[in-house]
Amino acid sequence: MKISEEEVRHVAKLSKLSFSESETTTFATTLSKIVDMVELLNEVDTEGVAITTTMADKKNVMRQDVAEEGTDRALLFKNVPEKENHFIKVPAILDDGGDA
């Protein structure tokens, strides 16, 4: 299935993305190849193959909750650019980025 450059531009507009003409051409070609590969996979006969939801053979691997000694605070704070009251101070990411 061929993905047209117009379809790429349409989806880009919906996603509020902008691409150059060469990027649009590249995306159209790449997406067409991806869709072709998925269509090829859809042709594979999976009759009689058990449904697989995970490749891991273990579920809910648990360990004992044991307190362990952490990193030496003096060593940890040695490379910290800013600290306050024995805490590492970082820029706030909410409320306009002011101090937390």
Curated annotation (Swiss-Prot):
| The keyword Ligase is assigned to this record | yes
* E.C. designation(s): 6.3.5.-
Q: Name one Pfam family in it.
A: GatC
Keyword terms of this UniProt record: ATP-binding, Ligase, Nucleotide-binding, Protein biosynthesis
Instruction: Please give the superkingdom of this protein's source.
Output: Bacteria
- EC category: ligase
What Gene3D superfamilies does the database record attribute to this sequence?
Glu-tRNAGln amidotransferase C subunit, N-terminal domain
- What is one GO biological process annotated to this record? regulation of translational fidelity
Q: Coiled-coil intervals in this record?
A: none
Q: Which GO terms describe its molecular function?
A: asparaginyl-tRNA synthase (glutamine-hydrolyzing) activity; ATP binding; glutaminyl-tRNA synthase (glutamine-hydrolyzing) activity
**Catalyses which reaction(s):** L-glutamyl-tRNA(Gln) + L-glutamine + ATP + H2O = L-glutaminyl-tRNA(Gln) + L-glutamate + ADP + phosphate + H(+); L-aspartyl-tRNA(Asn) + L-glutamine + ATP + H2O = L-asparaginyl-tRNA(Asn) + L-glutamate + ADP + phosphate + 2 H(+)
Quote the subunit structure annotation.
Heterotrimer of A, B and C subunits.
Q: Which HAMAP family match?
A: GatC
Q: What does this protein do?
A: Allows the formation of correctly charged Asn-tRNA(Asn) or Gln-tRNA(Gln) through the transamidation of misacylated Asp-tRNA(Asn) or Glu-tRNA(Gln) in organisms which lack either or both of asparaginyl-tRNA or glutaminyl-tRNA synthetases. The reaction takes place in the presence of glutamine and ATP through an activated phospho-Asp-tRNA(Asn) or phospho-Glu-tRNA(Gln).
Protein family: Belongs to the GatC family.
Q: What is this protein called?
A: Glutamyl-tRNA(Gln) amidotransferase subunit C
Q: Which organism is it from?
A: Streptococcus pyogenes serotype M1
